[in-house]
Amino acid sequence: MSSVPPTIGVLALQGDVREHIHALEQAGARARRIRRPDELDSIDGLILPGGESTTMGRLAAVFGLLTPLRERIAAGLPAYGTCAGMIMLADRLADGAPGQQTIGGIDMTVRRNAFGRQVASFEGTVEMTGVDGGPVEAVFIRAPWVESTGPGVQVLGRISRGDTAGRIVAVRQGRLLATSFHPELTGDTRVHRLFVDMVKG
């Protein structure tokens, strides 16, 4: 691995941009906001934060980012999607809105708002493969889950208890990572460290 800190962009259209930047810096990366296609040339990896996935897709199209994002990710740019960002990295949606567009890249089917609306948001812990030090603190806000994955996708984490036990909430495919939850809101930077290591990899 290189000793030079990687530069990781955070797509700054919606979501917890500042919190992701702070977590990336704590995890040993340089971080910058990404709003224009030309800014993609200056980064080694990209975080797609939470927000509202249909709005995020529309904004990405309006800002001329949708096609460049697809091309860069297809060409191997490491990316990490949280919540709505997970939806954006999905190849398929179980319940997509009419005309909803994603970036794709992970061979998975995702269900939006699977855990319920805002009132059903919750915090819990997730045992996550590839993350040392015990369970990860996880904040779920109108969160999706993964309905199914293709053979190249590694399931990293599932809900461990309750009536949603067994639901997939963290996956990896190659240099793409996605979680249903928001680690940037917890102060626990281990998932961001995992992604930084993937980018360095």
UniProtKB/Swiss-Prot annotation:
Gene Ontology molecular function: any one: pyridoxal 5'-phosphate synthase (glutamine hydrolysing) activity
Enzyme Commission no: 4.3.3.6, 3.5.1.2
Domain of life of the source: Bacteria
List of residues binding L-glutamine: G51, E52, S53, R112, I141, R142
GO terms (BP aspect): glutamine catabolic process; pyridoxal phosphate biosynthetic process; pyridoxine metabolic process
Pathway: Cofactor biosynthesis; pyridoxal 5'-phosphate biosynthesis
Active site residues according to the UniProt entry: C83, H182, E184
Catalytic activity: aldehydo-D-ribose 5-phosphate + D-glyceraldehyde 3-phosphate + L-glutamine = pyridoxal 5'-phosphate + L-glutamate + phosphate + 3 H2O + H(+); L-glutamine + H2O = L-glutamate + NH4(+)
One Pfam family named in its UniProt record: SNO
Keywords on record: Glutamine amidotransferase, Hydrolase, Lyase, Pyridoxal phosphate
GO cellular component: cytosol; glutaminase complex
Database matches in HAMAP family: PdxT (MF_01615)
Protein task: Catalyzes the hydrolysis of glutamine to glutamate and ammonia as part of the biosynthesis of pyridoxal 5'-phosphate. The resulting ammonia molecule is channeled to the active site of PdxS.
Subunit note: In the presence of PdxS, forms a dodecamer of heterodimers. Only shows activity in the heterodimer.
Family: Belongs to the glutaminase PdxT/SNO family.
Full protein name: Pyridoxal 5'-phosphate synthase subunit PdxT
Organism of provenance: Thermobifida fusca (strain YX)
